[in-house]
Amino acid sequence: MAPSSTLIYRGAGFGIAVSLCILAFSACEYEDPITSSPTRKVQEQLLGNWISQDGKEHMRVRQLDDNIYIVYYDGDLFRAYHSDVADTPFVSVQDINSDDRKYAYVVWKLSEDTKHLRLRSVNHDVIPNEKKNSSAIARFLEENATNPDLLGEEIQFNKET
């Protein structure tokens, strides 16, 4: 496994996969995505099957179209896309199995060898309730990009071969 110093931000697909895993641990809480549309296209190195470092969680990341990923995690389906803000690789992840279809926000890091993906969800306690639309959320994330409380615990996945 590459040390964290050699990890680079790459491939939202992995971010999406991570987002899905994080969603299983914390519910989707936001009415709107970070950005109203994707900020980049699907990246092939993010597609595939991922397994958590402890071997207990499995995630499948597939391409729906040029910009959207579909993630299958623990029996649930999620729709995800890149929502980069302030040079940070965010993804907007929508729970498509629930009636309210709310979003979660996740930051991802892909190792240089593209075999390891690290995900961190945005801490829902940090974003004020009045940040109700995509442009307000994106501005808030940009202004708070260096806030150490912005992101929650990291989860690591390894690509299945």
Where does each model-flagged region fall?
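Serine/proline-rich low-complexity intrinsically disordered segments, especially terminal tails, linkers
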Residues: 6-7, 21, 94
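C-terminal motif of bacterial Sec signal peptides marking the signal peptidase cleavage site
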Residues: 24-27
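N-terminal secretory signal peptides that target proteins for export/translocation
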Residues: 1-10
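Hydrophobic membrane-insertion alpha-helices, especially the h-region
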Residues: 15-21
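Short, intrinsically disordered, charge-biased short linear motifs at domain edges
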Residues: 13-15, 36-37
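Calycin-type beta-barrel ligand-binding domains and close structural analogs
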Residues: 29-45, 53-161
